[in-house]
Amino acid sequence: MYRIVIFFMLLTAVNVSADDSFSVYCLTTEQAENPVGIDSQSPRFSWKIYAQKRNFKQYAYQVCVADSPDKLMNSEAHVWDSGKVISDKSILVPFKGVKLKSSQVYYWRVRIWNDEDKVSAWSQINTFATGLLANSDWGNAQWISMEKDEGRVKGIHYQEEEALPTQKVGMYKLPQFRKQFRVKDKKISRAFAYVSGLGHFDFFLNGGKVGNHFLDAGWTLYDKEAFYVSFDITDLLQRGENVLGIMLGNGFYNVPQERYFKLLISYGAPKMKLYLRIVYDDASVQEIVSDKSWKVSESPVVFSSIYGGEDYDATREQPGWMYADFDSSGWKNVLVADYAPKMVSQQTEPLQIREEMPVVTYFKNEKGNWVYAVSYTHLRAHETL
């Protein structure tokens, strides 16, 4: 009798074990791997399938979501457990769980069944982090600027009857903002910064540029909405004093009427908004926001145009302005801007440096301009070296 029971137990274990002839990989949320800044209450999941058998077809799937990897591994998918869903869908499967929280990291995994009702092993665990799901989640963060917006004037460009309503187009100064704050002497669980800088911004923390993005944020109808970008800065913060820095360019938010241009429009002076949320291991929370406590100064960027390029005057640099020991007593207080667009998380792939070309030689021509020659090899499909 004892042998019969053991045999039955082994047979049962074999029947419920995963079939290793097919598996799930390449998990994405909203078509991105482990994204930060999801601002939808129903993000969509996708995955790819590996199968040894040809013409494999998914018969069913199960997606599980939790707010910690331990809970997920212990089958405590309290955020969402889809159960076994009879479907061959594996692209953009919508989340249908509990209401998601802002600035929260979620963990998810998936497994599938084939047409013989055999189940795969669970996939590896992937993550997604929510952004700020409502304007109210920005807390006390305010839009701040260096200068006031000029009054609205119609007819700056084109004929009066065809003109776009616009701010008066002027040479607004290009600002750099600074905020010093203290991180508590406790272990950080996670920290996210949400930044919108119009027209474009560079974000710095303790002297280093955060992320490898350029020309954030994306263009939009600025009188209706503004994009923000989410950054995971957990590993960049240090205990004690820290310094945030933001530099702004005009982008399409303010197009100056100098040099080459096509669309001539302005929504006002360059401005920015920031919300930083630090969660410590003891679950306590610290918030840093853009408000009147920030300082501002003119940046070394003396001209900025989406059409006409950028002029950077290195003689105007202020060494150390992004560090805690900098003396900012000569900087101005910021202005709080009267601006309240809908805040939308930027989900497009960012602009990034894809290739760098070394300078081979440089010289000063007869006009006093410096000319740089770079090395670049360009091959077409039928050419060889």
Q: For each of these PLM feature ranges, what is it?
A:
Residues 49-53:
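Short amphipathic, basic-aromatic surface patches that mediate peripheral association
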Residues 16-18:
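Boundary at the C-terminal end of the N-terminal hydrophobic targeting segment
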Residues 20-48:
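Pro/Thr/Ser/Gly-rich low-complexity, intrinsically disordered linker/stalk tracts
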Residues 58-105, 118, 140-143:
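Recognizes extended acidic, P/S/T-rich segments that occur
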Residues 288-373:
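Activation corresponds to long, low-complexity, non-globular regions
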Residues 4-12:
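Sec-dependent N-terminal signal peptides
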Residues 47, 84-93, 105-109, 114-116, ...:
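Accessory beta-strand-rich segments of carbohydrate-active enzymes
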Residues 378-385:
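Single conserved hydrophobic/aromatic residue that forms the stacking wall/gate
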